[in-house]
Structure formats: structure tokens, C-alpha cells
UniProtKB/Swiss-Prot annotation:
Chain segments carrying region Disordered: 1-29, 185-205
Name of the gene encoding the protein in the UniProt record: WSD6
GO biological process: response to abscisic acid; response to salt stress; response to water deprivation; triglyceride biosynthetic process; wax biosynthetic process
Expression induction: Induced in roots and leaves during drought and salt stresses, and upon abscisic acid (ABA) treatment. Up-regulated in the stem epidermis during active wax synthesis.
Protein name: Wax ester synthase/diacylglycerol acyltransferase 6
Pfam family membership, one: WS_DGAT_C
Residues annotated as transmembrane: 214-234
Protein's organism: Arabidopsis thaliana (Mouse-ear cress)
Membrane topology: Single-pass membrane protein
Active site, renumbered: H163 (proton acceptor)
Sites where a glycan is attached: N430
């Protein structure tokens, strides 16, 4: 695939009043240093569909007024030897930013698009980006603008950041702070209200207002006991996972022991958020519960087919009647489920920071939950939902995410970056996949005057052959898969299975409702 780029020759650097290139220096946080370790060199990529033809000059001018005013996006990473030169310190150093060095306007040759398949061309383009590291002599971000009409967008923008700039939640919030509502260009995007209080705490509050103080006290004590027990169990499982507890070697589990840097394939699919909300409201769950349950069903369908194809390939069961499933009866398949621990940093806070130079909390504030998927075919697809909800409800009544965050900081400070990176890498290598779910705007938004059709963020660089990201936007949900193509060569079939599972569960919910009305 041949891609030619052009750059604006005009001077677009952001100049400070001070003539010195280096304005200030700030040490990298321990988490940021881990993301630069060879075992854990992670990047965030977000593919953004645009409704109209992109005007690069407008985008560049908008970036000058917003994104590069953020300290991390106008700082480069500098390593300095200390003492005997065996130890190095890494710092963020403010620098002048030439925006056109970071904005790549791709001159796409239409004859290179095989069979006119622009979607496949986009996937190849993004996959190629995973093999090219960012230039550390400049701030660690890029924006690719593609004049490419795909099945779901008129043009496409691809944002690429190094994960050391911040966690996925803060980076996406920063991107959203650069955007405005299409209906009102002066207004920031609106996110759905999040009620962070759990059902457990709501019940406790209700009990405290009731007549039975004794019952309320019993509930409080029982809840505290379960919190401690769940946290201890989860902590022991995490320690065991770090040391020896491995997932089953399934067709979707990768091996990153010998190759730390691989070409990854990124694909996405957009489905109706209304379908997910219908299931959510009927089953009295959250959107995240539904997404986990559907993912469990989709993974079960995909693995069943992969195991069946494997048996056919080796010639097993050719003369006998095919069993109901070719999967092993007991499969341990766990996901590292990312949890945002950040006190709410709103889009407004980030917009004010870029406009006025104010400060707000920034960095990598994420914990992990080890979530076990119950893999298997079910006669009743709603069993996948109930099982996923039961597990995640127990995980919510645990301090596992906070504990992994605190333990990570302790290991970093006590043993250093290299040891911490190896421990995290080992823990993730013993699980199968990563999973995250981000809440997006509820109204159409524009990227410097360019209306957006979808956003598909993803991450690569960690030791998983499969990463699933979910991003809501307006009335749709975009599923992004990052896969190792040597392990999962058919990611679109996995997306097909996910979508079919969603429709199967939706049909089961509607059938149950119709029976209850009869």
C-alpha cells in the first residue's frame, strides 16, 4: 500500500514569549515510565468517522487553539543519565510545537484500493500505524487525515497517542473537549448522567430512613464483611495470576513471550444502542452488564466454531455424529477489565485548562479487575446476561480495582519500573484479553466544524491477542477489536458473532415480555 503525504510549508509552530525552547520540566510519573518499558510499550489509537470532506487547514488551526495548549501535547520526553549512567531519569520538557509535523494529510492513490474496498484499505492503513513508533524527539501524538470514503463515513481521521500521555478516559475526555455540539458550535459535548452510587448503597440509605434500624445495621455489617471477603479473594486471585494461574490455551489466546512488538489489526462495528438499552431496561441491568453478557455469548459462539474447524482440520469426528459443541467443558478465559479510578475530570475542566492555562488532575488513574467469562453454549441466551451481571456485581462489591492501582504504585516505588513492567506483563499474559467501555456524547458533535459519525478508540502494545473496546455515541455503540492477526485471522467473524448474540438476546427478552403479557 503506497501512501503519499503532503505538508503545509507555512510556519505553524506555536511560539512562546520566551525565546528559550525549554520552558519547564516535569518528571514522568511512575505509570508513564511503565508505558515506555519494552514489555509494555502501549499506544492509543482512535479512528473517527467524519460526515464531510476534511479541510486540513481548519483542523490545523483548531489544534493550535486547543489540543497543543495541553502540557502533555506540547512536551517531549527527554532521558537523562544519572550517576554512573546506568540509571536514567525521564522528564516531560515543554517545547515549541510545529503542528504540521504531527498532522499527516494522506494522499491516497485510488488505484491502490483493491476492488474499491475502502473499509479494508482503512484497516490496512491503521494496522500499518501499529508497526511505526512515534518520534520521541517530538511530542508523542499524531493525527492522520484521510480523504477516504468508507461505508460509514465520508472521510476519516486517525488519532494516535502514546499511552504515557494519560489513560484512555482522560485522553478521550481531552479529545471531546476539543469538540463542540453540531447544533450549537459554542457548546461542549454532553455526556449521560452517571449515577455512581451502587444499588447496595441505595438500599442502605433506604434502610437508614426506614423504621427498622436493626435491619439497617445488619445490612451495613453484612455489606462490610462481604466487601472484605470479596477483596481478599480477588487479591489472592490476582497474586496467583501473577505467579502461576494461567488461562486455558484457547484459539484466541496469544503468546507474546518471544515477540514484544507485533503488527496488530484494528476493526470496528457499529450497532444500535437502543437495542442494548431495551435489554438493559427489561432485565434491570446497566449498559455495561449487557455489553459483558453479549460479549460472553459472542465469544462462546466464536470459540465453538474455531474448535470445530480445528477438529475438522485434523480429521476428527468425520465419521461420527457431530457433538453439540466441540469446545472443552471447562475453559478458563479471563479479561483484564479496565476501571477508571479518576475523580471526575469533566470535559469543561479540560476545555478551561486549554483555554486559560488552568490545571486539573491528569495522568494514568486506572485499576484492573480480573473478570472471568463463562464460556459455553446456552439454550437460554439470557443466562449469559445473568451470569455476567452476577460476577460484575460481586466485583463491584470489592476493592480489587483500587488494590491493583495501589499495589502497582507500591511496586513501582519499591522495585522500580523494570520490575513493575515485568510483573504487570506477566499478570496480563496469564489472562486472555482486555476489555473496556467508554461513555460518549448523547448528541452529534463536530471536530472543528466536521460532524462525526462514529468514534472507535483502541489500545495496543500490551500482551493480549484480543482487546475489546466499546464506545457509545448518540444512539449507537461502536465495538472496536484490536487483534493479533496471527492468532485471530478473522476478526470480522467475531464481530458477526457479537452482533448475532445481541439480536438473539434481544429476541429472547422480547419473547419473555410477550409471554408475561399473555
Amino acid at each position: 500500500m503506497e501512501i503519499k503525504t503532503r505538508r503545509d510549508t507555512s510556519e505553524t509552530s506555536v511560539r512562546k514569549d520566551d525565546e528559550e525552547e525549554v520552558e519547564e520540566e516535569q518528571p514522568l510519573s511512575p505509570a508513564a515510565r511503565v508505558f515506555h518499558a519494552p514489555e509494555f510499550n502501549c499506544y492509543v489509537i482512535s479512528v473517527i468517522g467524519i460526515k464531510k470532506k476534511i479541510d486540513p487547514d481548519v483542523i490545523i488551526e483548531g489544534l493550535k487553539q486547543t489540543l497543543i495548549r495541553h502540557p502533555r501535547f506540547s512536551s517531549k520526553m527527554v532521558s537523562t543519565s544519572v550517576g554512573n549512567k546506568k540509571r536514567q531519569t525521564q522528564s516531560w520538557v515543554r517545547t515549541n510545537v510545529v503542528v504540521t509535523d504531527h498532522v499527516i494529510v494522506s494522499d491516497i492513490q485510488t488505484q491502490n484500493i483493491e476492488n474499491g474496498n475502502a473499509d479494508a484499505f482503512l484497516e490496512t492503513y491503521v494496522s500499518n500505524l501499529t508497526t511505526v513508533p512515534l518520534d520521541i524527539s517530538k511530542p508523542l501524538w499524531q493525527l492522520h487525515l484521510l480523504d477516504l470514503k468508507t461505508s460509514d463515513a465520508e472521510n476519516v481521521a486517525v488519532l494516535k497517542f502514546h499511552h504515557s500521555l494519560g489513560d484512555g478516559m482522560s485522553l478521550m475526555a481531552l479529545v471531546l473537549a476539543c469538540m463542540r455540539k453540531t447544533s450549537n458550535p459554542d457548546e461542549l459535548p454532553s455526556l449521560p448522567n452517571q449515577n455512581r452510587s451502587s444499588s447496595r448503597s441505595s438500599r442502605l440509605m433506604a434502610g437508614s430512613r426506614g423504621d427498622s434500624r436493626f435491619l439497617w445495621l445488619v445490612m451495613v455489617i453484612w455489606s462490610a464483611i462481604m466487601l472484605v471477603l470479596n477483596t481478599v479473594c480477588d487479591a489472592l486471585e490476582f497474586i496467583a495470576t501473577t505467579m502461576f494461574l494461567k488461562d486455558t490455551e484457547t484459539p484466541i489466546k496469544g503468546d507474546f513471550r518471544f515477540s514484544k512488538s507485533k503488527r496488530m489489526c484494528l476493526v470496528h462495528r457499529t450497532v444500535s444502542l437502543d437495542d442494548i438499552k431495551l435489554i438493559k431496561n427489561t432485565m434491570k441491568m446497566t449498559v455495561n452488564d449487557v455489553v459483558l453478557g453479549v460479549s460472553q455469548a459472542g465469544l462462546s459462539q466464536y470459540l465453538d466454531r474455531r474448535y470445530g474447524e480445528k477438529k475438522k482440520k485434523v480429521g476428527e469426528d468425520q465419521d461420527s455424529k457431530r457433538k453439540a459443541t466441540d469446545m472443552p467443558k471447562r475453559i478458563r478465559l479471563r479479561s483484564a477489565l479496565l476501571v477508571n479510578l479518576r475523580p471526575n475530570t469533566g470535559i469543561q475542566d479540560l476545555a478551561d485548562m486549554m483555554a486559560k492555562g488552568s490545571t486539573c488532575r491528569w495522568g494514568n488513574w486506572i485499576g484492573y479487575i480480573v473478570f472471568p467469562f463463562s464460556i459455553g453454549l446456552r439454550d437460554d441466551p439470557l443466562q449469559h446476561l445473568r451470569r455476567a451481571k452476577r460476577i460484575i456485581d460481586r466485583k463491584k462489591n470489592s476493592l480489587e480495582a483500587a488494590l491493583t492501582f495501589v499495589a502497582g504504585k507500591f511496586i513501582l516505588k519499591t522495585f522500580g519500573v523494570q520490575v513493575a513492567a515485568k510483573i504487570i506483563n506477566r499478570a496480563l499474559s496469564n489472562t486472555t484479553m482486555s476489555f473496556s467501555n467508554l461513555i460518549g456524547p448523547i448528541e452529534e458533535i463536530s471536530f472543528y466544524g466536521h460532524p462525526i459519525t462514529y468514534m472507535a478508540p483502541s489500545v495496543y502494545g500490551h500482551p493480549h491477542a484480543l482487546t475489546m473496546h466499546f464506545q457509545s455515541y448518540m444512539n449507537q455503540m461502536t465495538i472496536s477489536l484490536t487483534v493479533d492477526p496471527t492468532v485471530i485471522s478473522d476478526p470480522h467473524r467475531l464481530l458477526d458473532d457479537w452482533e448475532k448474540s445481541l439480536q438473539s438476546i434481544k429476541a429472547a427478552v422480547q419473547e419473555r415480555d410477550s409471554r408475561s403479557l399473555d
